Amino acid sequence: FELNGGVLHTMALAGTARVEEREAFGADEKEIREHEFVAQTLLAKLSDLGQTNRHSRDIMELGPLVHYHSAIDVELRKKEPIDRLVSLLHPTPALGPLPRTAETLGDLVAWRRRLGCPAWFGAPFGLFMDGFCEILVGIRMIRWRGPEVEVPSGCGVIEESRLVNEWRELRLKRESVRSVFGV
């Protein structure tokens, strides 16, 4: 998110396909629903902070992948501490459980540990300077373990998910990172 002059700008970003599949992706009801879980959760969390404005859902191209994207702006009623905004917004259902409770977050950490996944996947980081703040969440990464390179990835699983499609999405995300780093 970006915070500038009492206005918070953030986005819902969820649903993934290859850029070559953009047209079919635009009508994929499962991917739209997955995106809407994220967008609606953000709106619900932000509505108490001020006047919210959700922009139209569009498709954002990021390298070889496309994702559904909805910009969200909030005119804050009062100044909010940055750490409160980070904890309010992170993780969204794109990276974490829904509903997000201490129990479901604990379950996610336990599953990640059991699967050998890094517990710190999707960490927020940012810059705060002269009243301006920008916080990003790093969701694509590589990790070295001695001579080996790991490229973790995740996907949103909802009731309509099909296992073969989710495995494909995981592979697409890892391939996009590998191509950037040449591994």
Regions found by a protein language model. Name each.
Residues 1-33, 37, 120, 129-154:
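An anion-binding catalytic pocket shared by soluble metabolic enzymes
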Residues 9-111, 182:
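Contiguous alpha-helical scaffold segments within structured protein domains
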Residues 74-183:
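Conserved hydrophobic core element of enzyme catalytic domains
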